[in-house]
């Protein structure tokens, strides 16, 4: 496993991984915001009263 870090610079690899995960989280949240069920910004109640 240590030979992997001889091929890649650990700082650049961890920065790239962090940037990728941040962008992935943004994409997931924007997809959730585009649905009616998970759009928490519109102000609609989550569960309608019976």
Swiss-Prot record:
InterPro entries: Antenna_a/b, Antenna_alpha, Antenna_alpha_CS, Light-harvesting_complex
GO BP terms: photosynthesis, light reaction
PROSITE patterns in the record: ANTENNA_COMP_ALPHA
Compartments where located: Cell inner membrane
Membrane side Cytoplasmic: residue ranges: 1-12
Entry GO MF terms: bacteriochlorophyll binding; electron transporter, transferring electrons within the cyclic electron transport pathway of photosynthesis activity; metal ion binding
Domain of life per record: Bacteria
Periplasmic-side positions: 34-50
Topology term for the membrane: Single-pass type II membrane protein
Keyword set includes Membrane: yes
Assembly description: The core complex is formed by different alpha and beta chains, binding bacteriochlorophyll molecules, and arranged most probably in tetrameric structures disposed around the reaction center. The non-pigmented gamma chains may constitute additional components.
Similarity remark: Belongs to the antenna complex alpha subunit family.
Listed name of the protein: Light-harvesting protein B-880 alpha chain
Organism: Rhodoblastus acidophilus
